[in-house]
Amino acid sequence: MSKEAIIIQNKKRIIYEIYFPAFCRDFQDLANKIPYFVELGVTTLWLTPIFPSPTEHGYDIINHFDIKKEYGSFRDFDNFIEKAHENELEVLLDLVLCHTSSEHLMFKESIQGKNDCYFWSNHKLDDAWKICNENKQYYLAKWYYTMPQLNNQSAQVRTLIKVLIKFWLVEHKVDGFRLDAIKYASGDPIEFWKWFCKEVYKIKPNAYLVGECWEEFEISNKYAIETGMKTFNFEQAGWMKNKILHNSRYEVRNDINNAVIFLDNHDMTRISVDCNFNVDKIKNLLKLMFTFNHNDICIYYGTEIGMGVPNGYVHCGGHGDFHSRTKMNWYEVERQRRDPNSIFNYIKKLIHEYKSK
């Protein structure tokens, strides 16, 4: 069995979400941080979008077959993948397949009527339809006017995706994908993702796929059961927080084998803020996640040191977004390493015990 296959199989995964622009400079810098991931005990690295994009977050992709120039070259990327695999770490790329950037070549060609990869209308059907000044038609953009909706039923789009899958899984040896906003795929979302998973598993049978479905568990689990991917369990994240913060009843579910358990991410308020920076509450919340679950677990960068809103920032309602995407505090890592009672050393212990079960 190849080294690559061993990395994938028989593993209770501890996924570590890396919000790339806040965590490291480039792929050389990230490769140098691999000993940190090994020390922490995580098994899988999820990289938020690394593709060319006009925004920092990168969820509006200009080219799915390239890397942001400031992140380095493909040689740098491949060297990072090789070093990760040498240390038995998996790497997941964040794929956005429900929309693209309006700067994507495919969208520019669609404006000229050269493909059916997006949705067009002569009339504004509702507020999700935006005017295109070049052809005077309306295009569908559910998120923002710079993020036109992809036609996931288009043969051209699916051909592109098949090439894309092979490009990253085979040529650049990534181990799987985190799939963005899966319920927003156009047409029949479950049919599309079932097709996608089938194409991935044909190329790499042991690839790891996990989808973002910000819904109650029954809905997100339906995607997992019917498509073959795993899904993040947003509902359980809320249950765990309510248990620790408000002493609400918490029931352990035995039907969540397809779920990935987590507490926060790049779209949410950090748990340190939820806990008002109370170290005991943060530790209790982490303990609850690791103790009463047998699923794969995902940790957001900085959670291991109780990172939160810097001084002078004002906490705002809704998504945590900007305030949850601040630079990784490496000085705090060094400080907590030396403190046997720190969150950092506590979560290391929890991870070790969890993997040993």
What are these regions (language model features)?
Residues 81, 85, 89, 107, ...:
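Active-site-proximal helices and loops of the catalytic beta/alpha 8
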Residues 29, 72-76, 153-161, 188-192, ...:
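Soluble or luminal CAZymes and related metallo-dependent hydrolases
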Residues 284-293:
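Short, hydrophobic/amphipathic alpha-helical patches that form generic packing surfaces
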Residues 255-277:
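Active-site clefts of carbohydrate-active enzymes
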Residues 3-28, 36-43, 50-172, 195-204, ...:
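Substrate-binding/active-site clefts of carbohydrate-active enzymes
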Residues 14-18, 45-47, 91-93, 177, ...:
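Hydrophobic faces of well-ordered beta-strands that scaffold small-molecule active sites
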Residues 20-24, 51, 68, 97, ...:
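Short, flexible loop/turn elements at secondary-structure junctions
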Residues 1-52, 78, 83-84, 245-251, ...:
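Carbohydrate-interacting/catalytic domains
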